């Protein structure tokens, strides 16, 4: 059974199309107009082994906020759609990823309940090129709200802002991959004592 999600989101500020295949091989084709954000989405697809297509046309003449936010919302909705009924998945996933001096620890529960805990070092550089580093938390908030997952992201240390953000996306990719993969020992079983996720 194919586990593909496709979402189109159009507002007066942006036009977004996202397609994700959870059982892909990491083929990525992304274009948002925000170079560093594209780089992070590439990390998400490649390290999650998700086939990911993202096409966003946003009001970048204002700034990148709407473009990034709406893309993250559409990505979360597409991820939820691709998960389907969640029967037979592992549900939980975690990963710790270093990037030189930075470290990210990510744990996810595909619970159906949106919740984010996010910590990263204080006094980070405010910008990476045209990317506002305060947007990382907002990306995660937007994704979590639409995907309806519980997500804990902790960066206990790091100095380089690029590394701090990138290791979060790499760890998120691996944690989502592990949580969404099918468990061969749980075929046909929903991983919940409630009977619903």
Spell out what each predicted region is.
Residues 1-197:
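Structural preference for solvent-exposed beta-strand-turn elements
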């Amino acid at each position: 059974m194919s586990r593909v999600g496709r979402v189109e989101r159009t507002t007066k500020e942006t036009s977004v199309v996202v397609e994700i295949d959870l059982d892909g091989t990491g083929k990525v084709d992304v274009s948002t107009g925000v170079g560093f954000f594209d780089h992070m989405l590439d990390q998400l697809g490649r390290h999650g082994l998700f086939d990911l297509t993202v096409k966003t046309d946003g009001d970048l003449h204002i700034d990148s906020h709407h473009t990034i936010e709406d893309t993250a919302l559409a990505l979360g909705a597409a991820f939820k759609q691709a998960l389907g009924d969640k029967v037979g998945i592992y549900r939980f996933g975690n990963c710790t990823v270093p990037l030189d001096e930075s470290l990210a620890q990510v744990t996810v529960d595909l619970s159906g309940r949106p919740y984010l805990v996010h910590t990263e070092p204080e006094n980070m550089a405010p910008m990476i090129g045209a990317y506002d580093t305060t947007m990382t938390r907002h990306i995660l908030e937007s994704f979590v709200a639409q995907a309806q997952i519980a997500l804990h992201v902790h960066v206990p240390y790091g100095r380089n802002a690029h590394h701090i953000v990138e290791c979060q996306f790499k760890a998120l990719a691996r944690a989502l991959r592990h949580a969404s993969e099918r468990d061969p020992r749980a075929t046909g079983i929903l991983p919940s004592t409630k009977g619903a996720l």
